[in-house]
Amino acid sequence: MWINRLVKHPSYSVLRFYTKRLCTVSVKSLREFGVLPNSTICHSVYPRRTYVMGRAVINDILIKKSYSTHTVCAIDRSKDENNGSAYDKFEAKGIPIDVHTLKRIISSSGMDESEFSKSISYLFAKTVDPEPKDVLSLEDLSFLLNKLYTQRFQIRRICRDINAKYSEFWFKLFSLYAEKVDAKRNQVNLRNTKLDACEIFDANLMIKNFIELGQLGKAQKILSFILDRNPDILLSPKNADISTIVHFLQLRCGALAPYWKIPDNSEQKQGFLRKMVRLGAKNTSIRLSSTYKAMDHQTLLKIADLALQEKKLLNSEDLLSTLIQSFGHLGQTQILERCIEHIWQISPQEFPSHVVIKHRGCYPSSKILVSILVSFYFNDHDLHRGLSILDSFIKHYPDVKLDALFWRRLFQLSHFAWTPANDKKATSVVRCWHLMKQWYASKRLRPSVDYETLRQLYDIMKKTGNFPLGIDVLRSFKPGIERTRAENAGKVNNIIIKYQKCIIKELVNRGRFSAVREFIDSYGFDRKMTKDLNIFCANRMFLRSKKMKNKIENKKEREKVRLDSFDDDEDDGMIIGSLW
C-alpha cells in the first residue's frame, strides 16, 4: 500500500497522493496572492512541477510530514527558476491569520454545526481564497486545519482572553473534518474506502494536539476514527503507518512517560508512604489529564513483533522510543532487554572491547536513551540498571547526542532516588552533575539552558546547603543564561534570581563578604540585576548585623541575670550562715 510504495519510490508516492487533492487548491491560492506567475498555472505541460511547487509551500508553512520532498523540490527548482523565486517569496511572506479573524471564528465554536461551518468558510475566504464558498471542500478544510495548527499557541491565548474553551474549538473543527471525510465517501459510494495518506496525517495531527492539551479522551476518539476506517493500519507490513502506531502506543499501551507516577524518596517522611509524582508534573508545554492507564497489552506484543522485522519501522526513532516506554510501563523489562540487544546489540552483560557492534535499527538518540532510563527506573525504583545500559550505549555509540531532555530526566530520576537519611549531601545527584559537565567538555559544547534541570539542581542546593554547587551551575550555564535573558525567558530568569539570592544569603550568613562582592560582579548579568542584588545583599548584611547585635545583647543580658542570681545566692548563704 501507500507507505510501502513510499519507501521504494519516495518522490513518486508523495506526488501521486497529493496531486489530485492539493495541487489545484494550493496553486490557486498562490495565484490569488500574486506569488506564482499565471504561466505556471495555465500551462499543463508541467503538471508534476506545478504540484511540487504547491506541495513545497504547504510543507513549509503548515504540514510537517514524516517524509520530505526537499530532494524533489531542489531538482525542480534547478529546472525552473521561476518556481524557486516564487517559493522564496511565499516563505518570506508567511501570511498568518489575523487576530480579529481568529477571535471571530473561535467565538463561533459555541454555535451549532451549520453556523460554525459558515465561520470556517469565512476564515478560508479571508486567508486563502477570496472567492465566496457556501461549503468548503475537504481539501480546503485540510489546508486550513494545518494552517491553524501552526498558530495554535496564538489561538490558545485568544481563547484565554475571550473565555472560550480551546480544546472544544479544535474538537469541533475535527468533527467538521470527519463529517466531510464520510460525506465524500457517500457521494462516490465508497463508504468502506480507507482513509488516504493526507487524511491519516490530518487526523494524527489532531491527536498530537490533544495529547499536548491533556485531552486524552478526545485523542482516543480520533484514534478510533482512524482504526475504524483503516483496521490494518497497525499490524500490516504494507499499510502500517508510523504516526498512528506511535499514537496507539501512547494512548493505549502506556507510552506517555510524563504521565507515569514515580516514587519520590527525597520527600519521604518517617512513618509516611512515599510521595508519588509525575515526570511531567512541572512541565508547562503539555497538560496532564487526571487519569492515565494502559489497556491493550496483546496488540503491543504484535506491534513489537512487526517492528523488529520491518526495516522501515526499525528506522523510526519515535516508534522505537514509544515501544520501549510501552514495555517499561507494562513491566516487561526482560522483553525490553532482549529488544535492546536485538536492535543495538547492547545488553546488561558488558561486551569485550574488541567486539564491533552493528545496529539493526536507527542510530540510538537522546530520545531513545531517555525512554530506556525512565523505563528501567519505573520498574526498579533505582538508576543502577538503566545507567549501566546507558554507559554501554555511550561507549559503543560515541556519536550519540545527549540533549537537554536527557539530562533533565537524569536529574529528575536521581533526585527522586535520593534518600536524605542515607545521603545527606546528595552525592548521587552531584555525581550526575559532574557527569554532565564531563560529557559536554568532551564534546567541546556548552550545556543548553533547561528550566527543569536548573530547578532540580536548585532544590538540591537548597536542601543540602551546597552553595558551591549553585555557583558551579551558574558558571557552567552562564553563556546560555545570557542568551536566554536576551530572549526575555521569564521562568529561567526567575530561577536564576532564586539561585543568586540563595547563594548570597548563604555567603552573608557565613561572613564571607568579599566572596559576595565577587559573586555579584561575576553573575549580575546586567546593570539592573547587579543593582537589585547589591540591595538584597545590603539588606541581608543589615539583618545579619542586627541579628548578631541582638545575639550579643541577649548574651549580655543572660550573663547579667546569671550574675545577679549568683549575688542573690551569696546573700542568702550569708544570712543562713549567720543564723546557724
Swiss-Prot record:
Alphabetical UniProt keywords: Mitochondrion, RNA-binding, Transit peptide, Translation regulation
Assembly and binders: Binds to the 5'UTR of the OLI1 mRNA.
Gene name of the encoded protein: AEP2
Coiled-coil segments: none
Similarity comment: Belongs to the AEP2 family.
One GO BP annotation of this record: regulation of translation
Transit peptide as recorded in UniProt: 1-40
Keyword Membrane: no
Main location: mitochondrion
GO MF annotations in UniProt: RNA binding
Primary role: Required for translation of the mitochondrial OLI1 transcript coding for the mitochondrial ATP synthase subunit 9.
Subcellular location: Mitochondrion
Name of this chain's protein: ATPase expression protein 2, mitochondrial
One Pfam family of this chain: ATP13
Gene Ontology terms: cellular component: mitochondrion
